[in-house]
C-alpha cells in the first residue's frame, strides 16, 4: 500500500505545503458541495448501519493486508444511507478509520470553531463550502491520524469533481475507488419519481420512441423509471439541472479513476445484506463471510 501522506517533513507546516499547489489551482470562487448529508437523516444512518452489521458477522472478520500500510480507499456514488453505512462497516472490518467529509464539516458548525462563521454563512446563504476549507479540514484529519499511527482510511464524501480528485492526489495516494451504483434506478424513483434517466437526469416522454430508446447525451439505450411523469410531481427545473450537473461531474470523476485503473463499480441492492455480500465478493474477501452472494461487478 502507498504511504499514508505525501507530506515530507510533517513536523513543519505540512498543511500549508500540501495545500499550496492545490490552492493555486482552485481559484477564489472554487467550492465543494457537501450535499450528500442533506438527503438522509441521522436516524436513517444509524438504522442502515445496524442492518449492515447484522448482515456481516463480526466474529468471522479480521483485518486484511500486510506490510506497513493499510488500504487508502475512496467511496463514491449516489448519496444515501446505505453507501455511508457499508463504507463505515468496511472501515471497521479493515481496522482503518472511516472519514466522512460531511462529518468533518458538521464538527466545525460550532461557535467555538474558527471556521464557524465562514461555514455557517455559506450554508445560510445557500452557497457551497469553499474548497480551501474542505481540503484544509481533510488534510488536518489525515495528519492527526498519521501522528496517531493510523495506516489507512476509507474516505467518503470527497472527491465530488474531477478537479477535487486531482487535488486529492496531491495530498494522498489513493489505492482504490469503490463506486456504489444504485441499481434499478432506485435513487431517482425514491427521491424524485418520474421518467428520468438515472445517468443524466433527462426527462423522458414515452409517447416519443426516440426518448425511451436512446439518450442523446449518452449515445446509448436507456431504461428510465416508468412511474408518474415528472411534471405531475411538480419537479423544479433547478432540481433537474442540479441532477444533470451531478451526472456530468460524476462521469468525469469515473473516467478519471478508470484511466488510473483504480475504479471498481458495485451495483447496490435494496437489501443491505445483498449489497454487503457483493462488496465482499468484489474485494475478494469471501473468507470474511460464510455465504457470499455473487453480484455483477466490474473493474
UniProtKB/Swiss-Prot annotation:
<protein>
    <recommendedName>
        <fullName>Probable adenylate kinase 7, mitochondrial</fullName>
        <ecNumber>2.7.4.3</ecNumber>
    </recommendedName>
</protein>
<dbReference type="InterPro" id="IPR033690">
    <property type="entry name" value="Adenylat_kinase_CS"/>
</dbReference>
<feature type="binding site">
    <location>
        <position position="190"/>
    </location>
    <ligand>
        <name>ATP</name>
    </ligand>
</feature>
<dbReference type="Pfam" id="PF00406">
    <property type="entry name" value="ADK"/>
</dbReference>
<keyword id="KW-0418">Kinase</keyword>
<keyword id="KW-0547">Nucleotide-binding</keyword>
<keyword id="KW-0067">ATP-binding</keyword>
<dbReference type="InterPro" id="IPR027417">
    <property type="entry name" value="P-loop_NTPase"/>
</dbReference>
<feature type="binding site">
    <location>
        <begin position="127"/>
        <end position="129"/>
    </location>
    <ligand>
        <name>AMP</name>
    </ligand>
</feature>
<dbReference type="InterPro" id="IPR000850">
    <property type="entry name" value="Adenylat/UMP-CMP_kin"/>
</dbReference>
<keyword id="KW-0496">Mitochondrion</keyword>
<feature type="binding site">
    <location>
        <begin position="203"/>
        <end position="204"/>
    </location>
    <ligand>
        <name>ATP</name>
    </ligand>
</feature>
<feature type="binding site">
    <location>
        <begin position="80"/>
        <end position="85"/>
    </location>
    <ligand>
        <name>ATP</name>
    </ligand>
</feature>
<feature type="binding site">
    <location>
        <position position="164"/>
    </location>
    <ligand>
        <name>AMP</name>
    </ligand>
</feature>
<dbReference type="GO" id="GO:0005739">
    <property type="term" value="C:mitochondrion"/>
</dbReference>
<feature type="binding site">
    <location>
        <begin position="157"/>
        <end position="160"/>
    </location>
    <ligand>
        <name>AMP</name>
    </ligand>
</feature>
<comment type="similarity">
    <text>Belongs to the adenylate kinase family.</text>
</comment>
<dbReference type="GO" id="GO:0005737">
    <property type="term" value="C:cytoplasm"/>
</dbReference>
<feature type="transit peptide" description="Mitochondrion">
    <location>
        <begin position="1"/>
        <end position="25"/>
    </location>
</feature>
<feature type="region of interest" description="LID">
    <location>
        <begin position="193"/>
        <end position="237"/>
    </location>
</feature>
<comment type="function">
    <text>Catalyzes the reversible transfer of the terminal phosphate group between ATP and AMP. Plays an important role in cellular energy homeostasis and in adenine nucleotide metabolism.</text>
</comment>
<keyword id="KW-0808">Transferase</keyword>
<feature type="binding site">
    <location>
        <position position="106"/>
    </location>
    <ligand>
        <name>AMP</name>
    </ligand>
</feature>
<dbReference type="GO" id="GO:0004017">
    <property type="term" value="F:adenylate kinase activity"/>
</dbReference>
<feature type="region of interest" description="NMP">
    <location>
        <begin position="100"/>
        <end position="129"/>
    </location>
</feature>
<dbReference type="GO" id="GO:0005524">
    <property type="term" value="F:ATP binding"/>
</dbReference>
<keyword id="KW-0809">Transit peptide</keyword>
Amino acid at each position: 500500500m502507498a504511504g499514508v501522506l505525501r507530506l515530507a517533513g510533517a513536523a513543519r507546516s505540512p498543511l500549508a505545503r500540501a495545500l499550496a499547489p492545490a490552492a493555486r489551482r482552485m481559484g477564489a470562487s472554487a467550492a465543494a458541495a457537501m450535499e450528500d448529508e442533506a438527503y438522509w437523516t441521522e436516524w436513517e444512518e444509524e438504522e442502515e448501519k445496524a442492518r449492515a452489521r447484522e448482515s456481516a458477522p463480526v466474529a468471522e472478520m479480521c483485518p486484511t493486508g500486510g506490510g506497513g500500510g493499510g488500504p487508502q480507499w475512496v467511496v463514491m456514488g449516489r448519496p444515501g444511507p446505505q453507501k455511508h453505512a457499508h463504507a463505515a462497516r468496511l472501515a471497521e472490518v479493515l481496522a482503518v478509520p472511516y472519514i466522512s467529509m460531511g462529518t468533518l464539516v458538521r464538527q466545525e458548525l460550532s461557535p467555538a470553531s474558527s471556521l464557524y462563521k465562514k461555514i455557517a454563512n455559506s450554508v445560510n446563504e445557500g452557497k457551497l463550502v469553499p474548497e480551501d476549507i474542505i481540503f484544509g479540514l481533510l488534510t488536518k484529519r489525515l495528519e492527526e491520524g498519521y501522528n496517531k499511527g493510523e495506516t489507512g482510511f476509507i474516505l467518503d464524501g470527497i472527491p465530488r469533481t474531477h478537479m477535487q480528485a486531482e487535488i486529492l492526489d496531491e495530498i494522498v495516494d489513493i489505492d482504490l475507488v469503490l463506486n456504489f451504483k444504485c441499481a434499478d434506478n432506485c435513487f431517482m424513483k425514491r427521491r424524485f419519481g418520474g421518467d428520468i434517466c438515472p445517468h443524466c437526469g433527462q426527462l423522458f416522454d414515452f409517447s416519443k420512441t426516440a426518448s425511451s430508446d436512446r439518450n442523446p447525451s449518452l449515445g446509448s439505450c436507456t431504461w428510465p423509471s416508468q412511474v408518474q411523469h415528472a411534471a405531475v410531481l411538480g419537479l423544479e427545473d433547478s432540481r433537474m439541472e442540479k441532477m444533470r450537473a451531478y451526472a456530468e461531474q460524476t462521469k468525469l470523476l469515473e473516467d478519471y479513476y478508470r484511466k488510473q485503473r483504480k475504479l471498481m463499480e458495485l451495483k447496490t441492492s435494496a437489501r443491505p445484506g445483498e449489497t454487503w455480500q457483493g462488496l465482499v465478493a468484489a474485494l475478494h474477501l469471501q473468507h470474511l463471510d460464510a455465504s457470499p452472494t455473487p453480484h455483477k461487478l466490474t473493474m
